[in-house]
């Protein structure tokens, strides 16, 4: 079926995609590999050499960190995007960009097929397939691990049989995905929800009890909803995230252990490390509480939840997602200021916040005599505010609350 066909594979250098690359070669296809640097921290040249050794005709290594931060992470920050209220969606945010670049690479080499290493149980298969269909419906998507129905131990054996070096063993069978915005760890003993992750699972975050005994204060500056400075120093978003990952991670901040509802209908146990993402979203929410009206603050979480669901479900390039983007962007016009946080042994606590267009006014809020709040207006306000309730009670009296006749003795 694939004999002589050009196929561009989203290549990570890990077990799944390395097995796919060899499989394509065995099928007589002309496999090309695309490695997209989203901040994984792996030497790109090592990945290139590995793909060529396995059988890739050509390997594209593209640095997409700035595009990822600008076009995918930035909207997620403004939307406080957390799936299930906890997962900052770093993998889900990266997939539409990878699919977009796969299409570009396919056009460059004249490929008719693009491929990924997703399994049939995961969410990524949906994200890759749906995004490709949205951008290039003429291309055929191939997913060998899913279609082949090979389990992880079988993949490891296949890799060993074909001399494919992989960082996964039967003794350490973790599946890891990482980019600028976070790191996920799953599979192996982590599939038991009662199993506590051992220290070897984590790379970005220190064990909280072993973190420094002195707290670290950081100040994040925002302009129109986006972080632009760290401790007073203006930084590009990519560099700011990198620095904050290191700082917060050193203090054990940024771990998530959750049961997650996957798009395919099953629950999974997920371990995440996202020091910068969780701290930035925490700070951003705090600044919004200072600069947005009560009505916006009440309504925006519903938009944020739907934004997170669309991202998680692979519906990034859809009309609804674009409409939500427009709403969120409008809310961010005044979200400028700074938030100071205290990082200490796994916790991140807001220690202060300020904004040039803050809606908070100490003169109005203070209980001191110099308060400018006109308390004499309160009685009239309460009378009007409670009028509908009083009118309802008058027309529809509650018998249990009716006056009782005085008892006679």
Swiss-Prot record:
<keyword id="KW-0055">Arginine biosynthesis</keyword>
<dbReference type="InterPro" id="IPR018223">
    <property type="entry name" value="Arginosuc_synth_CS"/>
</dbReference>
<dbReference type="InterPro" id="IPR001518">
    <property type="entry name" value="Arginosuc_synth"/>
</dbReference>
<feature type="binding site">
    <location>
        <position position="184"/>
    </location>
    <ligand>
        <name>L-citrulline</name>
    </ligand>
</feature>
<feature type="binding site">
    <location>
        <begin position="10"/>
        <end position="18"/>
    </location>
    <ligand>
        <name>ATP</name>
    </ligand>
</feature>
<dbReference type="Pfam" id="PF00764">
    <property type="entry name" value="Arginosuc_synth"/>
</dbReference>
<dbReference type="Pfam" id="PF20979">
    <property type="entry name" value="Arginosuc_syn_C"/>
</dbReference>
<dbReference type="InterPro" id="IPR048268">
    <property type="entry name" value="Arginosuc_syn_C"/>
</dbReference>
<keyword id="KW-0067">ATP-binding</keyword>
<protein>
    <recommendedName>
        <fullName>Argininosuccinate synthase</fullName>
        <ecNumber>6.3.4.5</ecNumber>
    </recommendedName>
</protein>
<feature type="binding site">
    <location>
        <position position="87"/>
    </location>
    <ligand>
        <name>L-citrulline</name>
    </ligand>
</feature>
<dbReference type="InterPro" id="IPR048267">
    <property type="entry name" value="Arginosuc_syn_N"/>
</dbReference>
<dbReference type="GO" id="GO:0000050">
    <property type="term" value="P:urea cycle"/>
</dbReference>
<feature type="binding site">
    <location>
        <position position="117"/>
    </location>
    <ligand>
        <name>ATP</name>
    </ligand>
</feature>
<feature type="binding site">
    <location>
        <position position="272"/>
    </location>
    <ligand>
        <name>L-citrulline</name>
    </ligand>
</feature>
<comment type="pathway">
    <text>Amino-acid biosynthesis; L-arginine biosynthesis; L-arginine from L-ornithine and carbamoyl phosphate: step 2/3.</text>
</comment>
<feature type="binding site">
    <location>
        <position position="175"/>
    </location>
    <ligand>
        <name>L-citrulline</name>
    </ligand>
</feature>
<keyword id="KW-0547">Nucleotide-binding</keyword>
<dbReference type="GO" id="GO:0005737">
    <property type="term" value="C:cytoplasm"/>
</dbReference>
<comment type="subunit">
    <text>Homotetramer.</text>
</comment>
<dbReference type="GO" id="GO:0006526">
    <property type="term" value="P:L-arginine biosynthetic process"/>
</dbReference>
<dbReference type="GO" id="GO:0005524">
    <property type="term" value="F:ATP binding"/>
</dbReference>
<comment type="similarity">
    <text>Belongs to the argininosuccinate synthase family. Type 1 subfamily.</text>
</comment>
<feature type="binding site">
    <location>
        <position position="260"/>
    </location>
    <ligand>
        <name>L-citrulline</name>
    </ligand>
</feature>
<dbReference type="InterPro" id="IPR023434">
    <property type="entry name" value="Arginosuc_synth_type_1_subfam"/>
</dbReference>
<dbReference type="InterPro" id="IPR014729">
    <property type="entry name" value="Rossmann-like_a/b/a_fold"/>
</dbReference>
<dbReference type="GO" id="GO:0000053">
    <property type="term" value="P:argininosuccinate metabolic process"/>
</dbReference>
<dbReference type="InterPro" id="IPR024074">
    <property type="entry name" value="AS_cat/multimer_dom_body"/>
</dbReference>
<keyword id="KW-0028">Amino-acid biosynthesis</keyword>
<feature type="binding site">
    <location>
        <position position="119"/>
    </location>
    <ligand>
        <name>L-aspartate</name>
    </ligand>
</feature>
<keyword id="KW-0963">Cytoplasm</keyword>
<feature type="binding site">
    <location>
        <position position="127"/>
    </location>
    <ligand>
        <name>L-citrulline</name>
    </ligand>
</feature>
<feature type="binding site">
    <location>
        <position position="123"/>
    </location>
    <ligand>
        <name>L-aspartate</name>
    </ligand>
</feature>
<feature type="binding site">
    <location>
        <position position="124"/>
    </location>
    <ligand>
        <name>L-aspartate</name>
    </ligand>
</feature>
<keyword id="KW-0436">Ligase</keyword>
<dbReference type="GO" id="GO:0004055">
    <property type="term" value="F:argininosuccinate synthase activity"/>
</dbReference>
<feature type="binding site">
    <location>
        <position position="123"/>
    </location>
    <ligand>
        <name>L-citrulline</name>
    </ligand>
</feature>
């Amino acid at each position: 079926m694939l004999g002589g066909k050009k196929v561009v594979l989203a290549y990570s250098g890990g077990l799944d995609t390395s097995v796919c690359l060899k499989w394509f070669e065995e099928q007589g296809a002309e496999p090309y590999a695309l490695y997209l640097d989203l901040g994984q921290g792996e030497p790109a040249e090592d990945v290139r050499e590995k793909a060529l050794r396995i059988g890739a005709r050509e390997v594209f290594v593209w640095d997409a960190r700035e595009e990822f931060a600008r076009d995918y992470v930035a909207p997620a920050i403004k939307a406080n995007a957390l799936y299930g209220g906890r997962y900052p969606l770093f993998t889900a945010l990266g997939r539409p960009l990878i699919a977009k670049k796969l299409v570009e690479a396919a056009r460059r080499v004249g490929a008719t097929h693009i491929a990924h290493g997703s399994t049939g149980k995961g969410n990524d298969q949906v994200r890759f397939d749906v995004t490709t269909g949205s951008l290039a419906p003429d291309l055929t998507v191939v997913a060998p691990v899913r279609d082949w129905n090979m389990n992880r131990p079988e993949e490891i054996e296949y890799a060993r049989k074909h001399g494919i070096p992989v960082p996964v063993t039967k003794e350490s069978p973790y599946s890891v995905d990482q980019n600028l915005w976070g790191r996920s760890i799953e599979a192996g003993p982590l599939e038991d929800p009662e199993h506590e992750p051992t220290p070897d699972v984590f790379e970005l975050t220190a064990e909280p009890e072993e973190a420094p005994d002195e707290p670290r204060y950081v100040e994040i500056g925002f302009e129109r909803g986006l972080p632009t400075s760290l401790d007073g120093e203006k930084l590009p978003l990519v560099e700011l995230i990198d620095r904050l990952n290191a700082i917060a991670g050193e203090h054990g901040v940024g771990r998530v252990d959750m049961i997650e509802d996957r798009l395919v209908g099953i629950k999974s146990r997920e371990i995440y490390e996202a020091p910068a993402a969780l701290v930035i979203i925490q700070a951003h929410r705090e600044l919004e509480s200072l600069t947005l009206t009560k009505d916006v603050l009440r309504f925006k979480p519903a938009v944020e939840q739907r934004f997170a669901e669309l991202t998680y479900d692979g519906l990034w390039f859809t009309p609804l997602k674009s409409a939500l983007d427009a709403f969120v962007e409008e809310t961010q016009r005044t979200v400028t200021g700074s938030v100071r946080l205290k990082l200490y042994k796994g916790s991140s606590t807001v220690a202060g916040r300020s904004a040039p267009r803050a809606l908070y006014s100490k003169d109005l809020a203070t209980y001191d005599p110099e308060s400018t709040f006109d308390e004499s207006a309160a009685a009239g306000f309460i009378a009007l505010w409670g009028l509908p309730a009083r009118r309802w009670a008058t027309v529809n009296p509650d018998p249990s609350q009716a006056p009782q006749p005085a008892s006679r003795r």
